[in-house]
Each structure stands twice: as structure tokens, then as C-alpha cells.
């Protein structure tokens, strides 16, 4: 009962809605990219949701999945055929060789967000890069 009371207090008097940018601007711009976050802030959204993982060399990076995913990752202009390396086992320099600026159109994820912008050359950003952007 006590926890219900505290939860209700959070809603008391609130007459506005806070809009959050999920992974930046997922579905509009490539998720978890600096361009996606820049877009989100540019349209006036002040709250963002993101995930942070550590690379093998200890760099905090912004990415949702523990691996690079074939539906959103290209290397040397080609989509990955299978899941890529684990973020935790990849150095930041190695991770930066992958392009995460689009969705593979034929994938389920690509079909789910067919209007998402394709931004060539987007890499998994470091947390510090987002902090500088903010």
C-alpha cells in the first residue's frame, strides 16, 4: 500500500507529458547515433533513452545490443550476414569500422521502419561524444 501511495504522488498535479527520444529518434533516424540524437534535440525533445556498453578497451559506447546486428550494420559497404562481434570483445577502433547508419530494407526491422533515414558513415558513438553534443 505504501508503494502505491508513492507512485500516486508522482502523478499528482502533473498536467503535461514528457516526450522521450527512444534511442535518439528510432524509426526516423538511425538509432543510437549522434545524428539521431542531434535530430531529437533539434526538434525540441529534451529527454533521451539510451543504452551504454563497454568495449574491450574500456570505452563506454551507445548501443542497444551486445553484438553488432546484421539488420543495421554494414562493413565495407556490405551488410553483415550474421551477428557481428560482441561489443565487449571489440576495441573502439575496430567497432568504428562498422557503419550503423541504416536498416537493411529486406530485414524485419527494416520493414518495421521503412521511412527511417539512411545516413551513410554513422558509427557507434562514444558516450563522451554524446555528452559533448548535449
Please identify what each model-predicted range represents.
Residues 1-134:
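Phosphate-group recognition and catalysis centered on beta-loop-alpha active-site segments
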